[in-house]
């Protein structure tokens, strides 16, 4: 039988890292089993759902490389279908109209709270007579539709990640609301638990993979599946993503949306690679750098951990740096060039760009690191304290720079490649009895304003090509 999986996000915000990982796990299992992966947009909350969030979610999934089969389904287009199923539940006696007002519910909650009881509805209108219903309707009372949940009912299923899970009806908060309020004999707009069941059945979903925060929803939904005589899918509940303190990752942890990761300079391949290991581990593998295709070959839902997965920034940064190091230079240039363009920096040539990127990429964790790493090659570096001290405390330093400057001007050298740079340093060192180390440190201070930086010889070649090496040396001799 074909495996059919889905992601069902609500477009009430930007694509979250947790939603993206859920999408990834569904996508990986679909690929592993030659199944299908679908998108369903759960936009029945008209007030909070925004089309721009739908666009953001789909764009984010595309960016991560998570393609889907068929056009996404939108729940807002299927309201009448949900209402038909609610009507069916009413007809078979599995659901009923509840006229409890908001103020009555608030009063009930306060009593339960003061008594130290968990919040749950008291099902007070489950057995209303037809005359009582008519009386409420004549008063103009609005109603919701509630699904009957017997306190003694036991719900259990075999979860592919957690094994057998059991719930008692009494632990589900009372009879479940299926629809929003409506007047008269109308049925209000459907709510999450009803719509999900109807859609998963309609889409022939065979496997539901979602976060552990949905476990109680699964218990409720199983009862609706059975009442509507729908075939149950196989359920899997993934662990939550936790922050460094072991609490659920939230917006308070600064970065949670895929847009933010993208803007920070994470590569989609790296982020997807890292997300796969957030709660899942691969057996007998020496490498943690794996493409989605490679991961899909060995992925199994049963290998996902039950315990929460702590988000590790250092690990993500390391994985991202490996992808930067491995990326084809011309492709990496296209990405980094965007940052340079935003800074208003212009380079002498595409070839020069490639040389610079090759020089700095081993020091980059994120794409945006290219700004700081390449800044000295586009703008004059400020002289730092250690650079000033080196210039002022060693007589040989300024002498070294004078010799280099004179040589460049006397020989009328316009550009310098790596071999020429080494030749000049060797020649001046021998002819003037100056240690090569002093010469190279002096040049480094001239170029970068400090004693650290990328490879000096390759750097000199780049400074020479953009005609700034002489200017940088001269500023140290003023």
Swiss-Prot record:
GO BP field: glutamyl-tRNA aminoacylation
EC number: 6.1.1.17
ATP-binding as UniProt keyword: yes
Binding-site positions, ATP: 251
Motif ('HIGH' region): 9-19
Entry keyword Protein biosynthesis: yes
Chemical reaction(s) catalysed: tRNA(Glu) + L-glutamate + ATP = L-glutamyl-tRNA(Glu) + AMP + diphosphate
Pfam families: Anticodon_2, tRNA-synt_1c
Gene3D superfamilies membership: 1.10.10.350, Glutamate-tRNA synthetase, class I, anticodon-binding domain 1, Glutamyl-trna Synthetase, Domain 2, Glutamyl-tRNA Synthetase, Domain 3, HUPs
Residue positions of motif 'KMSKS' region: 248-252
Subunit field text: Monomer.
Protein family membership: Belongs to the class-I aminoacyl-tRNA synthetase family. Glutamate--tRNA ligase type 1 subfamily.
Record protein name field: Glutamate--tRNA ligase
Native organism: Prochlorococcus marinus (strain MIT 9515)
Native organism taxonomy: Bacteria, Bacillati, Cyanobacteriota, Cyanophyceae, Synechococcales
Gene name as annotated: gltX
């Amino acid at each position: 039988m074909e495996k059919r999986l889905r992601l069902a996000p609500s477009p009430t915000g930007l694509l979250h890292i947790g939603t993206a990982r859920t999408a990834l796990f569904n996508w990986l299992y679909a690929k592993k089993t030659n199944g299908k992966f679908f998108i369903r947009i759960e936009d029945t909350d008209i007030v909070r759902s925004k089309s721009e969030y739908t666009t953001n979610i789909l764009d984010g999934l595309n960016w991560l490389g998570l393609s889907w089969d068929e056009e996404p389904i939108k729940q807002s287009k299927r309201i009448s279908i949900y209402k038909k199923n609610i009507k069916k539940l009413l007809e078979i006696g599995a659901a009923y109209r509840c006229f409890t007002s908001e103020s009555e519910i608030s009063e009930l909650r306060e009593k339960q709270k003061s008594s130290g009881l968990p919040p749950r509805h008291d099902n007070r209108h489950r057995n209303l007579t037809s005359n009582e219903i008519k009386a409420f309707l004549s008063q103009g009372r609005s109603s919701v539709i509630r699904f009957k949940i017997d306190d003694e009912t036991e719900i259990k299923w075999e979860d592919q990640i957690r094994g057998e899970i059991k719930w008692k009806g009494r632990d589900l908060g009372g009879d479940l609301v299926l629809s929003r309020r409506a007047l008269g004999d109308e049925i209000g707009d459907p709510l999450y638990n009803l719509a999900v069941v109807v859609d998963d059945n309609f889409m022939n979903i065979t496997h539901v993979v979602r976060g552990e925060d949905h476990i109680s929803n699964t218990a409720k939904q199983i009862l609706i599946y059975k009442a509507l005589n729908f075939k149950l899918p196989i359920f899997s509940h993934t662990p939550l993503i936790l922050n460094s303190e072991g609490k659920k990752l939230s917006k308070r942890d600064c970065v949670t949306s895929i847009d933010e990761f993208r803007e920070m300079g994470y590569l989609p391949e790296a982020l997807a690679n890292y997300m796969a290991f957030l709660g899942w581990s691969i057996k007998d593998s020496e490498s943690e750098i794996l493409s989605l295709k490679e991961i899909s070959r060995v992925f199994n839902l049963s290998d996902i951990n039950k315990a929460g997965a702590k988000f590790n920034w250092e690990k993500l940064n390391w994985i991202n740096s490996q992808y930067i190091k491995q990326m084809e230079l011309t492709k990496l240039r296209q990405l980094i060039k965007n940052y340079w363009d935003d800074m208003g920096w212009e380079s002498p040539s595409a070839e020069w760009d490639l040389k610079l990127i090759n020089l700095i990429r081993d020091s980059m964790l994120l794409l945006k690191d290219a700004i700081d790493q390449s800044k000295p090659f586009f703008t004059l570096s400020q002289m730092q304290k250690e650079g000033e001290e080196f210039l002022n405390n060693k007589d040989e330093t300024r002498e070294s720079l004078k010799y280099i400057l004179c040589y460049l001007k006397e020989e009328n050298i316009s550009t310098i490649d790596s071999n020429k740079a080494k030749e000049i340093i060797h020649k001046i060192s021998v002819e003037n009895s100056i240690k090569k180390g002093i010469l190279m440190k002096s040049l480094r201070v001239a170029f970068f304003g400090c004693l650290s930086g990328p490879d000096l010889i390759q750097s000199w070649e780049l400074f020479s090509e953009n005609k700034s090496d002489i200017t940088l040396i001269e500023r140290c001799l003023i």
